[in-house]
Design a protein with these regions (language model features):
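Strand-loop-strand
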Residues: 4-266
Length: 266
């Protein structure tokens, strides 16, 4: 089996893979994936490649159960530009192992961000007024709950991500570089929903509050649950003052608490 010029694109997500190649061979009840590769966007978009095999262990030739399928897959990313959107750029390297046995899919590995730039949406983005109501023309048919469950069951995922040396974030008054490691976990116990564990720190940067540009002195984001709602522990101070004056940010990303700060008390 062989295929060339494979591609995958999504303008909404900023995904643009091309120049793909596939080389595989069938051997009895086994398919050996000798080569699979895709290039990332642009001249320096990097590459993702995979090798492995899929074995069909069914005794009955008419069986279609995934419990009869065993898969081992090794995936390598080398400077792969995963997203190329203007407000979301991400390049990663690392390795991921995929395995399926008795209908259960497992993904483990470690990735490192070579470069990232995330621009958070501005608070002034236009939205519909509260008096605007959108009514559906027809009720969509009932479907399974929106979890990570698939025909292969709920995937068991554990992938560690190192934010690397150049992970930039800007928006909501914040401009900083993030550093640290987090682990992406998804399993049946979380109903397939992705969760993050780990701690991320800010490295310098600025935070705008009450019309003032403040320097971030301390910034910690602690993840232990949903990826979009870490615990916040941030101290940002006005520069070039004899007294430490600024704000503290506590709570969570979805419910932050911003308070004035002074040391010593004013």
């Amino acid at each position: 089996l062989q295929a060339d010029k494979l591609a995958a694109r999504s303008a909404i997500q900023g995904i643009e893979f091309s120049q793909g190649q596939l080389r595989a061979r069938l051997q009895d009840q086994k398919m050996v994936l000798e080569q699979f590769s895709l290039k990332g966007a642009g001249a320096q978009g990097g590459e993702v490649s995979a090798q492995g095999q899929v074995v069909w262990n069914a005794l009955n030739a008419e069986s279609t159960s995934l419990h009869d399928v065993q898969m081992d897959l090794h995936i390598t990313a080398r400077g792969l530009r995963v997203s190329n959107r203007a407000d979301r750029r991400l390049t990663v390297s690392g390795q991921v192992e995929g395995r399926m046995d008795k209908g259960q899919m497992q993904l483990t590995g470690q990735l490192s961000a070579d470069q990232a730039q995330f621009n958070l949406p501005d608070d002034t983005t236009p939205t519909l007024g509260e008096d605007v109501v959108i009514r559906k023309t027809a009720q969509a048919p009932a479907t399974a709950k929106a979890t990570g469950r698939t025909l292969m069951g709920t995937p068991d995922v554990r992938v560690r991500l190192d934010l690397g040396p150049d992970f930039q974030v800007q928006g909501h008054g914040l401009m900083t570089r993030l550093a640290g490691q987090v682990t992406l976990v998804s399993s049946a116990s979380s109903q397939g929903q992705p969760r993050l564990t780990g701690e991320v720190r800010t490295e310098g940067g600025r935070f705008k509050a009450y019309g003032q540009q403040l320097q971030i002195e301390q910034g910690l984001l602690r993840f232990n649950g949903p990826f979009d709602n870490p615990q916040l522990d941030i101290v940002a101070l006005r520069p070039n003052l004899p007294q430490r004056v600024g704000v503290t940010v506590a709570g969570t990303a979805l419910a932050p608490r911003i308070r004035l700060y002074a040391d010593p008390d004013m």
